[in-house]
Structures are given as C-alpha cells and as structure tokens.
C-alpha cells in the first residue's frame, strides 16, 4: 500500500488529462478576480528534505524507507478547497493521506470542476523513492482560477502530509514571477498513530488538520517530537517559477525518475537536529548479596530506548548499585 502512488503514476496522468478539458469553466461566487493577462504557466519543483541528519528520530530505513508519494494538485478559485488547517479533510484526502490512494481525491476534484466550476486544471508529479530528492511538473493558472493547492504524502506515516493550501499566484494585476516556500508536516486528523510505522488506528471522531511541530503532539513517542527545538526544520520545499514562453498544449512531465534525477541534499546545508538519549525506567532492585554481618550490595538496571545522535545528550549510566543488608542471612 505504501508504494501505491508509484504504481499508479501512468494511470494517474491518463485520468488527469481526461479531466482537464472539462474543468475550465468560470468560478461561482463573488470573489475578486485577478486582472493579470489571461493565462500563466509555471514550473513547480518539489524538493524533499527529509534526511536522517535533520530528522534522526525513528527515521525509516526499511519496510518501507523514507519516501514521498506522488504530488497531486489543482489550480482553482476560492470556491474550492483541497485541504485547510483546522478543518476536516474530505474522504478523498483521507485516503490519500493514509494510504496514498488518489482516485477518490481525483474524483472530488473532477466534481468540483464540473459542478462548482471552480477548478481550472489539475497537475501531478511523480513520487520520490527516498526522503531527499526532487520531482517537478508544470501547471497552468487562469485569472479566475489563480489559486494553487497540492498535497504530498509522507511515506511511511499514519496520515501525515505536506502541501500548499490556496496559494495565490496573482498579485493585483500581475502574475508572480517566483514563489519559494518551506513545507512542514501536517496531520490529516484521521489516524491516531504517533510514529512513522504505527499500525492503523482510526481517529474517532475525526479531528481537523493540524500542523505537527517539535512539541505538538506533546508526547515522547511521536516521531517529530524534539523538545530541544523551538521549531522543526523544513521537511520539504516547493518552488514555483513562471515560464516566459507562450502557453502551449498541456504535456505531462516524464515519468522516468532516473532521467529527471533526484537531488541529493548537500549534508553541509542540512541542519543537524540533536537527538537526546532516551532510557527506560529502572528495573526493580535485585537481591542483596554479601556475607552475614556485613553490608552487601544490590543492583538495578535500565536500557537504552533511543540512541543519541547529532551531539544530543549522551546516555546516563545503565547500572546502579547500592549498599544493603544481605537477604536471607542466617
């Protein structure tokens, strides 16, 4: 299930291209309209920055290793919302955030384009098979549909994702030339798992979308819990660049990740997030040993739960002794 976005890549494009022709209607509602020239075309580059250096706690190495799903987005008006912080996600976005299944979300986007006339175009980019790397595509925006939203699932995770909600690429009467944004993890509010590899544990009743921070959820088991940090480093970045060439027919990007290449993030530019050692509680004291009439010794132990990394606090002593009166002395 975790790699379903990789397998659905080509089918996703076929579906998206079929939708584009039917989702270019005018929006409903009375929102202000962008007065920029009729159409603008942008390249969008998504860069994953999810490295073991920046996010050492419980970093997924196997089954599956850290990676990103395909990117799915839409150019739309204010009548449509793909997702929004502090609001409930749709069933389609729930399926995408939990399992990487895009079909229901794509159907919702199609319905918004046909019924609400609020979606101008949809776009997608291939998945990234590692935590660090990049993927890209192109999108077209229209003065009446100048907002852009997208989501990318964090794999593996219970229901965590990154994305953009209703970014306006129009500013007054002009299209923005470039937009660069750092991205941070969000919880879709549909699964209560605390760690990347948590088993499915539905949130009942469903919660709203929340941003995951270094201190929230405030639980040591959470994979993003770093109490020494004021804020998490960005886990991804997205760049929109306006293309100067005249509009042309929409063409999907190459689905060959090898030809595009994955950006390997320079380790010198990645912040080192300190990970402190975590140990268990002490065990019970053992029996007191020693000769009768003299003080003996007893001991207890604890074990390392999380090894320190990136100059985090080192582990304390794992064994402790104390004087005692010998047990069962005759």
Swiss-Prot record:
Coiled coil: none
Gene3D superfamilies: F-spondin domain, Thrombospondin type-1 (TSP1) repeat
Occurrences of domain Spondin (ranges): 30-220
InterPro entries: Spondin/Thrombospondin_T1 (IPR051418), Spondin_N (IPR009465), Spondin_N_sf (IPR038678), TSP1_rpt (IPR000884), TSP1_rpt_sf (IPR036383), TSP1_spondin_dom (IPR044004)
Site (described: Important for metal ion-dependent interaction with integrin): 140
UniProt-annotated location(s): Secreted, Extracellular space, Extracellular matrix
GO MF annotation list: antigen binding; lipopolysaccharide binding; metal ion binding; signaling receptor binding
Main location as per UniProt: secreted
Glycosylation sites: 282
Binding annotation for Ca(2+): 159, 187, 191
Domain TSP type-1: 276-330
Annotated GO CC locations: extracellular matrix; extracellular space
Protein residues bound to a divalent metal cation: 140
GO biological process, one term: mast cell mediated immunity
Signal peptide feature range: 1-25
Keywords of the record: Calcium, Cell adhesion, Disulfide bond, Extracellular matrix, Glycoprotein, Immunity, Innate immunity, Metal-binding, Secreted, Signal
Annotated S-S bridges: 34-170
Tissue: Detected in heart, lung, thymus, spleen and lymph node.
Physiological role: Cell adhesion protein that promotes adhesion and outgrowth of hippocampal embryonic neurons. Binds directly to bacteria and their components and functions as an opsonin for macrophage phagocytosis of bacteria. Binds bacterial lipopolysaccharide. Essential in the initiation of the innate immune response and represents a unique pattern-recognition molecule in the ECM for microbial pathogens.
Oligomer and partners: Monomer. Interacts with integrin.
Listed name of the protein: Spondin-2
Origin organism lineage: Eukaryota, Metazoa, Chordata, Craniata, Vertebrata
